[in-house]
Swiss-Prot record:
NCBIfam families attached to this UniProt entry: PRK03757.1
Organism: Escherichia coli O17:K52:H18 (strain UMN026 / ExPEC)
Compartments in which it is found: Periplasm
Encoding gene per record: yceI
Disulphides: none
Keyword Signal annotated: yes
Domain of life: Bacteria
Transmembrane segments: none
Signal peptide: 1-22
Similarity-based family: Belongs to the UPF0312 family. Type 1 subfamily.
Name listed for the protein in its UniProt record: Protein YceI
Record SMART domains: YceI (SM00867)
Entry keywords, A to Z: Periplasm, Signal
Main location: periplasm
Amino acid sequence: MKKSLLGLTFASLMFSAGSAVAADYKIDKEGQHAFVNFRIQHLGYSWLYGTFKDFDGTFTFDEKNPAADKVNVTINTTSVDTNHAERDKHLRSADFLNTAKYPQATFTSTSVKKDGDDLDITGDLTLNGVTKPVTLEAKLIGQGDDPWGGKRAGFEAEGKIKLKDFNIKTDLGPASQEVDLIISVEGVQQK
């Protein structure tokens, strides 16, 4: 009986310790500590940079068990900004993002794997009415206590998507078939 009680207590402690390791975070967009950026070559001569100004998301981070990590992000595609009003209007049109019909893009992770010091985050990206798997390579920038009594964790992730994979058929030339994604987020741990 003592062995059973001891085993049950040990198992209970192990379960409690394991579940306490994973932490849930809300992306800190209000504090301007998160960015969803992209770049694409312009006719093969230069890079055109842009950002989405309105998005929201959460992530679960467990440094010891990446398989338990999760990422969920929703982007308001009408918030696209390339620092040029007419171009932004064109990007919102049916030629590109078709924001009248598809005002949101979403990313929901399906797996997270450790790759050396990096994390490979694979998930379903829904953009322009099409859902495709995308893998982002992420790096932990840092984590710890903040000056206001909370805890934070920050990551930077990069990936590529092909325009035609998401039913964006406007041809900008051979050097402009893919978009680079550059995402930087800082999350505030939820209590």
